[in-house]
From Swiss-Prot:
Residues 1-73 form the S4 RNA-binding domain. Catalyzes the 2'-O-methylation at nucleotide C1920 in 23S rRNA. Enhances motility. Enhances biofilm formation. Involved in the assembly of 70S ribosomes. Involved in virulence by promoting adherence and invasion to host cells. Involved in pathogenicity by modulating secretion of host-protective chemokine interleukin 8 (IL-8). Involved in susceptibility to antibiotic capreomycin. High methylation activity of the 50S ribosomal subunit at 37 degrees Celsius. Loss of activity at 42 degrees Celsius. It is an enzyme of class 2 (transferase). This is 23S rRNA (cytidine-2'-O)-methyltransferase TlyA. The keyword Transferase applies. InterPro entries: RNA_MeTrfase_FtsJ_dom (IPR002877), S4_RNA-bd_sf (IPR036986), SAM-dependent_MTases_sf (IPR029063), TlyA (IPR047048). One of its GO terms (biological process) is rRNA 2'-O-methylation. Changing residue 188 to A: Loss of 2'-O-methylation activity at nucleotide C1920 in 23S rRNA. Reduced motility and impaired biofilm formation. Reduced adherence to the surface of Caco-2 human intestinal epithelial cells and impaired capacity to invade them. Disruption phenotype: Cells lacking this gene have no 2'-O-methylation activity at nucleotide C1920 in 23S rRNA. Impeded motility. Impaired biofilm formation. Cells form clumps which lack the structural roughness seen in the wild-type. The cells are less bulky, but otherwise they have no obvious alteration in dimensions, shape or flagellar structure. Accumulation of 50S ribosomal subunits and reduced amount of functional 70S ribosomes. Reduced adherence to the surface of Caco-2 human intestinal epithelial cells and impaired capacity to invade them. Keywords: Methyltransferase, RNA-binding, rRNA processing, S-adenosyl-L-methionine, Transferase, Virulence.
Length: 253
């Protein structure tokens, strides 16, 4: 059974709506996103080899958990960071964190779930942080605040950054001044390559060479600051328009 058919039946929605949810990576099967053509029946058969599942019906079995991203997280960004942390075994517990570009709070939500000691949330916008996060005493919110003018008497054990419509290279100096050790940056090529690079109608970049050059320039800029690159990998979730994005995990020396 195809994943799109499974989603339409399980959620009692049209096939087109199911496809829309899947293409936007807004529906998860057992915590992960899959393509519309993914074989759910085969997936279930493999689960049965290691788990005692009941009942047998593919649409009723408790072995297949279907979740809508909007019902779990305040934004898609949350799942991006969650997957990256889990895949790299990065420990957040008891760390004083700074989140740059907090927006609705996707990264903030995951830092909280991972028991961060305190989170300073920074954003140039206003009234964006989700209501469920605004009242949390661990969060110190700075709205209408540009990183380049932000002042802090303390430095942060972990800095996360997810920004749009600006190149990360323009922020590295300011991040370096605030960082004690760990830095996790979401690199978005669509905001790094310049305006004249080929894109499709949705805004998805179509120039691999330009993307590679932008990444190399970014990595060189980080290296000049003395940062040690621990890992870089594609985000498990693409940008809203479908652009591939990349996580970078650095240690400040």
């Amino acid at each position: 059974m195809r994943f799109d058919f499974f989603v339409s039946k399980r959620l009692n929605i049209s096939r087109n709506k199911a496809l829309e949810l899947i293409e936007n990576e807004e529906v998860l099967l057992n915590g992960k996103s899959f393509k519309a053509s993914f074989d759910v029946k085969n997936f279930l058969e493999n689960l049965k080899k290691t788990q005692d599942l009941n009942p047998e019906d593919i649409l009723l079995t408790d072995g297949l958990k279907l979740d809508l991203l909007s019902e779990i997280y305040v934004s898609r960004a949350a799942l991006k960071l969650k997957n990256f942390l889990e895949e790299n075994g990065i420990e957040i517990k008891h760390k004083n964190c700074l989140d740059i570009g907090s927006s609705t709070g996707g990264f903030v939500q995951i830092l909280l779930e991972n028991q961060a000691l305190k989170i300073t949330a920074l954003d140039v916008g206003n009234n964006q942080l989700h209501l469920s996060l605004r009242t949390n005493e661990k969060i110190i919110l700075h709205e209408n605040t540009d990183l380049r003018t932000f002042k802090s008497e303390e430095k942060f054990e972990l800095i996360t950054c997810d920004v749009s419509f600006i190149s990360l290279i323009n922020l590295l100096y300011y991040i370096d001044n605030l960082a004690l050790k760990e830095i996790i940056l979401l690199f978005k090529p669509q905001f790094e390559v310049g305006k004249n690079i080929k894109r499709d109608k949705k805004g998805v970049l179509k120039d691999d060479k330009a993307i590679l050059k932008a990444r190399m320039d970014f990595e060189k800029a980080c290296a000049k600051l003395g940062w040690l690159l621990k890992n870089t990998q594609k985000s498990s979730i693409k940008g809203k328009e479908g652009n591939v994005e990349y996580f970078y995990y650095y240690i400040k020396n």
